[in-house]
């Protein structure tokens, strides 16, 4: 990208939609100019954010008994069409491969919108005994959905380039339920590492995953007050096991159907991270996922330039040996232009080293998240930088948590809900009846996210739709 383009002004974050679209380009995360609607190209810098984010996901899954695998992209139509309720949820979104070259295929092949119907025929072959449980596999793949709504990079795509889907198999319904709870905990930890606080809720029956007994989900509240679904966990019961004949031999020798779960995270995790933490200057990245964690800016005068450059290179090498991703900006740009460039890219920490700093054996450290400036002794630069990273991570999470709480409103009637969802998320009593939930959604003009997994009960209240007493409150929000 040319320097003149990089110097273009980023819209203010309060104009969130414009800010988001421009930031993806100006910070070199994604290029939207690919000639197919809903398909986008990762810039190398953006892909490095993706790589670091998915490294966290892999680490957390691998350390909890999951194993990574890879299944084919193409799903035969006869397998795809087996689970009727599941297909109802996806049939209008499927891309079909109907020809090989110029020859029609005997069996059309679906590009996976999700992989249950690709994986479970193999699970039928692999699962034999109760000793095989729990089976916990995951893959990180691209999936395709023919989105007819307005597409948006990282948020609503026709090609989801980074879909992490886990699929587990268990002996009993209760074992699968325990896995759902574990998965929610794992996802919460992933987002803690990204400094993104989440809402956790159980979706209403009409919004659960097609073919599931129930769905739990994680949502982030975006700067415009809308919620973004950033993780889902589905208890599949034995529904898919019956469809795909996944049985196991129990300890008593009896053949029984297995119980399953599946859960997914996509690049929406990155959309939430950059949206929640970013500011009017550009990205603000948690240190763990920043492609460049530290940028060193030499402050050059006529005298002492060689010594300053040498000191900057020395600090760079020391930080690299400590496992820190670091760059020295020795370009001909003015210091102000360098600050602009690296602030746009969200580099967590800037170190400035000039002749006077060398005399005092220090570097000036500037935090990207707060702009706070102080000094770190060069003798202990590695430890000093690590302490800054810890402080940045803690500050980002606490700030985002406070912002989230300020956007949750406990309401008493539907008109108040209608008003408050323009700012964030409302809670309202609900008796649990489907007809009441749908009537409330219709009145409000927004959806019920679900019942909070950590209840927000205020004692006995009345359902605003029917007047029945209830102690349950639900989240209501505008959604992406």
Curated annotation (Swiss-Prot):
Protein name: Proline--tRNA ligase
Reaction(s) catalysed by this chain's protein: tRNA(Pro) + L-proline + ATP = L-prolyl-tRNA(Pro) + AMP + diphosphate
Position of the signal peptide: none
Gene encoding the protein: proS
E.C. no: 6.1.1.15
Keyword Transferase appears in the UniProt entry: no
PANTHER family recorded: BIFUNCTIONAL GLUTAMATE_PROLINE--TRNA LIGASE (PTHR43382:SF2), PROLYL-TRNA SYNTHETASE (PTHR43382)
UniProt keyword terms in alphabetical order: Aminoacyl-tRNA synthetase, ATP-binding, Cytoplasm, Ligase, Nucleotide-binding, Protein biosynthesis
InterPro entries with a match to the protein in the record: aa-tRNA-synt_IIb (IPR002314), aa-tRNA-synth_II (IPR006195), aa-tRNA-synth_II/BPL/LPL (IPR045864), Anticodon-bd (IPR004154), Anticodon-bd_dom_sf (IPR036621), Pro-tRNA-ligase_IIa (IPR002316), Pro-tRNA-ligase_IIa_arc-type (IPR004499), Pro-tRNA_ligase_II_C (IPR016061)
Subunit record text: Homodimer.
GO terms (BP aspect): prolyl-tRNA aminoacylation
SMART domains listed in its UniProt record: ProRS-C_1 (SM00946)
NCBIfam families xref list: proS_fam_I (TIGR00408)
Family: Belongs to the class-II aminoacyl-tRNA synthetase family. ProS type 3 subfamily.
GO cellular component: aminoacyl-tRNA synthetase multienzyme complex; cytoplasm
Compartments in which it is found: Cytoplasm
Free-text domain note: Consists of three domains: the N-terminal catalytic domain, the anticodon-binding domain and the C-terminal extension.
